[in-house]
Amino acid sequence: MHRSITHPTLPALKAKFPNTTYHVAEFRDMITVLVPAQNLLETARFLRDDAALRYNMLCELNGVDYLHYPHATHRFGVNYGLTSIPHNIRLWLKVYLDPENETAPGTPGGEVRDEAAAEQGDPGLRLDSVTSIWPGAEWMEREIYDMFGIFFVGHPDLRRILTWNGFGNFPLRKDYPLRGVGEREKYKIITREGA
């Protein structure tokens, strides 16, 4: 039996952006709005600024690699968990991204020849930064960049946060080898006795 999804945000989005197609999903009373990548910034700004919505808190921001998911139609997803404190409502935004080149520099199987190109990443994995809307996104976007190679355009300080500069790979991608690509062999193991 199909039941319609109701949420106070959905009519507001349809009214504000009549020419944008948003897909909506519900799971355990949580609503997820699938946003086209090119519409992320204007959608996020509207959700924060509209008086009837006021999604003023970004609670969660994460990346997902769907490489081995059986029914996945896209390679990567970026999820934004939003809360409107004044109206006590919650919403998830999801943006799907697909790499243009599966062996782009900085991916396993792709040789890093040009550090600048590797830092910019695959053109298909570029997404507008939401740090101008929710400043708390700054470190979360850096982590997604570092772990998945998704480049956030307009980020004030997009650089690696968990791995070192020049690492050249993105370890949370599903095609990244579980044992790494030589990182363990490059560094001396420090034992408790030798420290």
Language-model segments: residues:
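Terminal low-complexity/charged segments
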Residues: 1-195
